[in-house]
């Protein structure tokens, strides 16, 4: 599934991805390509994920991800075929990798072309709540709430 909001700049070779993200690891991973970063559940065998809390142990144990960013204490919960990237701070490392795949997500600027829905032709056609803005490429389908 593609990301509707931001362009994915991948794929990246894992060694290049870690280098661009300023993540130093002792492991010498093969030059495998990583296509995206996803959560533990949806990551597949060409993607990287992250595991930062014991609360997600059950999900981590069945992830299909090619690589997983985690801590040394949580790594034992991952499947054997998932390459572990051991870091001190999982969330910081995840943010760095996300920035590499989706650099525009870091500077998601406000869209100055949005309009107050009260000042559009939709005003009398639909029900809406407070503080609703409409921007470019917005489509309202049937039965939207």
Predicted regions and their residues:
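Domain-scale signature associated with acetyltransferase and cell-envelope carbohydrate enzymes
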Residues: 1-145
